[in-house]
From Swiss-Prot:
GO terms for molecular function: fructose 1,6-bisphosphate 1-phosphatase activity; fructose-bisphosphate aldolase activity; magnesium ion binding. Pfam families: FBPase_3. Disulfide bonds: none annotated. It catalyses: beta-D-fructose 1,6-bisphosphate + H2O = beta-D-fructose 6-phosphate + phosphate; beta-D-fructose 1,6-bisphosphate = D-glyceraldehyde 3-phosphate + dihydroxyacetone phosphate. Belongs to the FBP aldolase/phosphatase family. SUPFAM superfamilies: Sulfolobus fructose-1,6-bisphosphatase-like. Residues 374-383 have a biased composition (Polar residues). Pathway: Carbohydrate biosynthesis; gluconeogenesis. Its EC number is 3.1.3.11, 4.1.2.13. This is Fructose-1,6-bisphosphate aldolase/phosphatase. Mg(2+) 4 binds at residue 232.
Length: 383
């Protein structure tokens, strides 16, 4: 059977600042999705949150970018936003960048990851959802899951994985993508995805039969809106087992609390902290950036689960290390490398401050202006 899993998220307002979704807004979204299930638009659904993001997980048979499915999600977010405004929640409707729905949600603010598959006899999946960071935050764990044999033993042991995987990498600034093969193009792949603010792993395919293995949301709100309107808070769907990473291999990729951009005001680097659903809320310095994982099985278009994947003492040390790194990074205050690099600050109010100070700068005769790099040009696209 062919079925689709759609994970669509948005920040529609939260309690006490950028902290946590209010249960009444989730109840409002639930009413919309329950009606869509009754009408047969979707077959099953699950609603959750990570931090201030409302997450809609829906299964159906309508394929990707289906108008009715996306309109259902839009209606759920709008109804939840109404409740947010009634309760006076913070940043009500923040991620909804348009006033009206127009066919599908692409470019309208919500983050979208959709996996359209021919179901295997057993179809286990993991859905990872992050708060206070951006889509490129999944570059490192996706590389480890699908290309690093030190993380994923199946790359060595499983014959169906031994040929490797294909990585579709998107340049979010130019709107262009390139497909790179692992292991033979591993170094070129790392050359791109090591700049996660620009190059994002969008999809991964098994090289042996071109079967899709993962999909990541790629919406970057500031690039859509032209200003800072909150971090993108990405979602990731990964297929598991039998020719794909085992569940334990997928989770192993998050055992190291690596640094990601986002955190406070979307302007700081901090460690990603994998947590249980009950701890999925932003606290210290609006973070540290949180990650939850839910495990499901898909059968005949319906969802069995979830399992709260990080609700386990095996990740206690990861969380402890993330807390130590949090403390270390915070001691830098407004200085880099805690604060993001200038190119990533362009969509904050920092350029306004610099413009205000411009008249006070004066030319120093004994200092030459830097020459442009010979390795870059005004047009950095790959035409």
């Amino acid at each position: 059977m062919r079925s689709t899993v759609s994970v669509i998220k948005a920040d529609i307002g939260s309690l006490a600042g950028h902290h946590v979704v209010h249960p009444d807004t989730m109840a409002a979204a639930n009413r919309v999705l329950a009606e869509a299930k009754r009408q047969g638009i979707i077959l099953d659904y699950y609603i959750t949150n990570v931090g201030d993001d409302l997450e809609l997980i829906m299964s159906h048979t309508r394929g990707e970018l289906d108008t009715k499915v996306h309109e259902t999600a839009w209606d759920a977010f709008k109804e939840a936003t109404k409740v947010s405004k009634e309760l006076g929640l913070y940043a009500a409707g923040q991620d909804l960048l348009s006033d009206s729905f127009s066919g599908n949600l692409k470019g309208m603010g919500p983050g979208i990851a959709e996996l359209d598959i021919e179901e295997r006899p057993s179809e286990p999946i993991a859905i990872f959802m992050a708060d206070k960071t951006e889509p490129g935050a999944f570059n490192l764990p996706l590389y480890k899951m699908f290309a690093d044999p030190f993380n994923t033993a199946g790359l060595v042991i499983d014959p169906t994985m031994n040929e490797g995987f294909k990585f579709e990498v998107l340049d979010v600034y130019e709107g262009q993508s390139v497909v790179l093969n692992s292991p033979e193009e591993m170094y070129s792949l790392l050359g791109l995805i090591g700049t996660p603010a620009r190059y994002v792993i969008r999809r991964v395919y098994r090289k042996a039969d071109n079967m899709i293995g993962s999909v990541t949301s790629i919406e970057r709100l500031n690039l859509i809106a032209g200003k800072y309107v909150g971090k993108d808070d990405p979602v990731l769907i990964v297929r598991l087992q039998h020719g794909f990473p085992a569940l334990g291999e997928a989770l192993e990729a998050f055992s190291f609390p690596y640094l990601v951009p986002g955190w406070m005001r979307g302007s700081h680097y901090g460690p990603i902290m994998p947590v249980s659903q009950r701890d999925a809320k932003a606290t210290r310095f609006d973070g540290p950036p949180r990650l939850i994982g839910l495990g499901f099985n898909v059968k005949n278009g319906k969802l069995t689960g979830p399992s709260d994947l990080f609700d386990d003492p095996a990740f206690d040390e990861t969380r402890r290390m993330a807390s130590v790194i949090t403390d270390y990074m915070r001691r830098h205050g407004p200085f880099m490398p805690h604060r993001l690099e200038p190119t990533e600050m362009e969509y904050t109010t920092l350029p306004t401050l610099i413009e205000k100070l411009k008249p006070r700068f004066k030319k120093e005769e004994d200092v030459k202006k830097a020459k442009p790099s010979v390795y870059t040009s005004k047009d950095q696209g790959m035409d």
